[in-house]
Design a protein with these regions (language model features):
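Amphipathic alpha-helical polymerization modules
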Residues: 1-137
Length: 137
């Protein structure tokens, strides 16, 4: 049973690490949602997307969550008419980041809920360990 609890703790901890990283990336996306380049022809900030992977921990016999990579979102930039901006093209349009605040808020909420679920799993595992130790006394 101790190995099962140890596996549960490791799985939940890896999930918490992954979701914590995801929250950092979402925060970075939100922080850069209005940033532009300072010159014509330069690209503005591109939304970052976190991809996860399952990794087998042979010692525990459990699949853990790890960050596979962080990729740039290849969707189109938004165009905003601002002919006085230094990065405006010859038609007066400025490319803005491809960050949608609503999508980022939803992504943040999902990561937060996943983080909380993993935290609850750790707390449940700790309670089970305490009860098991109590029974052995």
């Amino acid at each position: 049973m101790a190995n099962d609890l140890e596996s549960a703790l490791s799985i939940a901890a890896s999930g918490m690490r992954a979701q914590g990283f995801r929250l950092k990336v979402v925060a970075q996306n939100i922080a850069n949602a209005s940033s532009t380049t300072d010159r014509t022809g330069g690209e503005p900030y591109r939304r970052q997307i976190v991809n996860f992977a399952n990794v087998l921990d042979r010692e525990l016999g459990a699949k853990l969550v790890e960050i596979k990579n962080v990729k740039e979102d290849s969707s189109q930039f938004k165009l905003v008419y601002d002919p006085n901006h230094p990065a405006a093209n010859d038609k007066g349009f400025v490319e803005m980041p491809n960050v949608n605040a609503l999508v980022e808020m939803m992504d943040m909420r999902e990561a937060q809920r996943s983080y909380e679920a993993n935290l609850n799993m750790i707390e449940s595992s700790k309670r089970l360990m305490s009860r098991t130790i109590g029974l052995l006394r």
